[in-house]
Amino acid sequence: MEPVPFLALASEWVYTPRMRIVSVVLLLAASLLAESVAGLKWTAPSGWKSEGARPMRAATYAIPPANGDAAGAECAVYYFGPGQGGSVEANLQRWKGQMSGADGKPANAKIAKRTIHDLPVTTIDTSGDYAGMGGPLAASKSVAKNYRLLGAIVEGPEGNIFIKFTGPAATVAANEHQFEQLLNSFEKW
């Protein structure tokens, strides 16, 4: 018997009603895994545990620690409403100010702009001693040594979405690819 090319076999498939139903159910299940706010949707990377929404947060993800790190990381997706939450530049400055170098001055930050699915996105990458835990209303300001912050601001049709991924530098580095997956999954809903 002569081998038959795969595409020839695929074109001869007959989809039964049961196969069609299973296909639709699988597509619906995949879309339910996507989260959304402000006219945008995204999909969290596998291995990141969703902790759901919190006040001012559309989503929060817990990331397990990398080998050698005592603490895990957190990725928060913020949405404050149309025209709320401050400008892109104001948020970049605030995030830069939360990370300091060994000299106590704000740490250097890499800022980049790109487009993902026709959405303007500005990213920040900075490392150092992190003093942004607990948010601006925290009673005390504890500082976490050797942390890294990857952030992104996605300019959506109903307002900006702010993504802030913070944690021990090694844990964030081990999950940088997953953070990129998260960013690349953002699209209009």
Predicted regions and their residues:
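Solvent-exposed coil/turn segments that connect beta secondary-structure elements
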Residues: 80-82, 127-131, 158, 166-168
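Secretory pathway targeting signatures of secreted, lumenal, and periplasmic proteins
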Residues: 43-102
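Sec-dependent N-terminal signal peptides
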Residues: 21-32
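Signature of long, low-cysteine stretches enriched in small and polar/charged residues
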Residues: 46, 56-58, 92-154
